[in-house]
Every structure is written in structure tokens, then in C-alpha cells.
Amino acid sequence: RSENTRKAYARDLLDFCQTIYRTTDLRKALSRFLSLSEVEAGMTLTKFRQLLRERGAQPATINRKLSALRAFVDHARKRGIVNWRVTDLVKGEKQRTDPKERIRQHLPAVTAEGIAEALRKVLDAFPERGLQSLRDKTIVALMALHGLRRVEVARLSLSDLIDEPDGVFSLRIWGKGDKFRVIKLVAETTKLLKRYLAALKRAKIEPKQDALGVPVFVSLRKSKGKRLTLTQLNNIVDAALAKAGIKRKGLSCHSLRHCFGTLAATSVPIPDLAAYLGHSNIATTGLYAHAVNAVNPADAVSELVLEAA
């Protein structure tokens, strides 16, 4: 599993320990949990699910936390520590909305035209000059015009930039499970990225190499030169949405990816879009819409968002 998945599981296990055993001592609490009989474990898991409901947790959140516990117990079961399974003891929550409806809840509008207009507002909200503005606009463009995940933007290193003969960049994208794909940027995003890198050099800010390489997007103040964190990317996108006047609950970094997928699916074959987005399951891509006419997904979206401006 990816590092982010492992961290998410650790947070969910910690929540379980704090909620049930009132402690942050993971080792002690989880050992106690694994010592329970099958009946006791079932009662404990049911109690945890009920407390999450009372807390107001969404079905998807409850299911994710139960999934973390299931993975942990399955590992213990393989080692002969327990002989019961979470799956047999507690049921997950039923999703109240279908997957397509969940995507719609994270979109800024209900029509393709409205979504394109919202993305234009976000991209137009950035000042033309300034290193921070260039950095942040480039980040938003990669998510909105190319459908990159937040973690994919964070992991971009200079070695992932491919300068094509026609002057545009292609990017080597490291997605879930350390799988990579190569996508071609549109001219406008390439221009933004080149301007940002040039401005970074003029400001004499040296990106600091880490385990992933030399980062593309770095902090400009505290921890200057270090790779931006996922939290920092959240803050950048939230600020951009607020400046554009469209920020509300449910809109986030991933909303920009949903916008890209929804717009691209109006004119791009699902298999092409799945490859561009890095979906291992084509059914996930199919949630966005039905497709026609084979074109570059990024070209389709940039035409809707940029050329109509």
C-alpha cells in the first residue's frame, strides 16, 4: 500500500483506540483488542460503529475506518493471533447516494458550462505577477486542466518533466501504488510551469532534494525550498476557491479532478480518459459520463475552460 494509505489507516486505528479505549497508546490498545473473543470483538466493533454514527460521521468515513480495522485484523489472522474476521462481525454502512451523485456533490455546478465557468473564475482569480501566484496557479491548472490528484502534484520532481520537441511539457506522474503514467500538458499549462520555474530561479530559491528527488513545487517561506505538503496544497486550493467566490463545503482539491473528469467525459472515450487519469478500474472513469470522439482529454478541457474565456 502507498505511504498515504498507510498513514490514513494509522489515523483510523488511532481514532478507534481513542474512541473505545480512551488512549493514544496504539500498541497497548490494539493488543487488548486482539485478545478479545469473537463475541467480544463483535460487540466492540458494533459499539465503535454506533459511536461514529452518533458523532455524525458519513457512511464513507465509517466504512473507511472499518476497512482499516479489517486490514489490521486480517494481518493478525494470517499470523495466527486471532481466528475471527471483522467482515464476519460487523456490517459496513449503506451508501446513501450512488457514486455519480457523490461526484455531483463535489462539483461547483450541475452543467458542463457551469463547471467550465467555475474553473475559469478560479484560474482568473490569480494575479498575473508574483512567484507565489505563479506557483499556486500552476498547481490549480494541473488539477483542473489535467486532473492530477493532490498527491501526484506533491510528488512531482524536476526529473519528471519531459521537454517535448514541440515545446510543451509531458509529465511522468506517480500515482497510487507507485504506478506511473506519462501525460502531455496543454500549451497554457506548460507556459505557466516554465514561468514558475524561471521565477523560482530568479528568486534564488533552490529546491531541496528529498527521497523523491528535486521537488517542482516548494515552500516559499517557512521550510523554504522544501517540497509542499498535502496540507499546504489543500490550503492553496481552498484559498483559490475562496478568492473565486465559489468555496463551499464539499469543494476541495479532488473537486478540481472531478471537474476535469466530468468535462473531459463529454468528448473523450472512457478508455482514453481512464488512462489519462490513472484509473486502474475503468468503471470508476465511467461514473463521469458517456463519451464520444477520441481526443486528448487535456485538449478537450482546456478548450472548454480557456478558449471560451
Label for each model-derived stretch:
Residues 1-309:
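Conserved catalytic core of the tyrosine transesterase superfamily
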